[in-house]
């Protein structure tokens, strides 16, 4: 008997009713980093936000945002 893998993505969010999920992606990225700032890098509470932004955001965007955060030029409110 094989183990079944259950695939999940970010749940629907009433703040983002349209099919364009760019803003949803950016918001989840910011929520994750705000959570880790408030609760620490190892907080399990923040892991859901990480799963959401990883499911919604293209990897290139995340890489760029991470570089911007490190250099202090990230445009969002963290």
Curated annotation (Swiss-Prot):
Domain of life: Eukaryota
Name of one Pfam family that matches: COX6B
Keyword Transport listed: no
Location within or outside the cell: Mitochondrion
Segments carrying motif Cx9C motif: 25-35
Disulfide bond positions: 25-57, 35-46
GO cellular component, one term: plastid
InterPro entries noted in UniProt: COX6B-like (IPR048280), CX6/COA6-like_sf (IPR036549), Cyt_c_oxidase_su6B (IPR003213)
UniProt entry keywords in alphabetical sequence: Disulfide bond, Mitochondrion
CHCH domain mapped to chain residues: 22-65
PANTHER family found in the cross-reference section: CYTOCHROME C OXIDASE SUBUNIT 12, MITOCHONDRIAL, CYTOCHROME C OXIDASE SUBUNIT 6B
Family: Belongs to the cytochrome c oxidase subunit 6B (TC 3.D.4.8) family.
Function: This protein is one of the nuclear-coded polypeptide chains of cytochrome c oxidase, the terminal oxidase in mitochondrial electron transport. This protein may be one of the heme-binding subunits of the oxidase.
Protein name stated in the entry: Cytochrome c oxidase subunit 6b-2
Source organism of the structure: Arabidopsis thaliana
């Amino acid at each position: 008997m094989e183990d079944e893998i259950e695939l999940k993505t970010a749940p629907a969010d009433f703040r983002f009713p349209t099919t364009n999920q760019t803003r949803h992606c950016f918001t989840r990225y910011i929520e994750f980093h705000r959570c880790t700032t408030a609760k620490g890098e190892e907080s399990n509470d923040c892991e859901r936000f990480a799963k959401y932004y990883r499911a919604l955001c293209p990897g290139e965007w995340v890489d760029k945002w991470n570089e911007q955060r490190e250099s202090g030029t990230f445009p969002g409110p963290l």
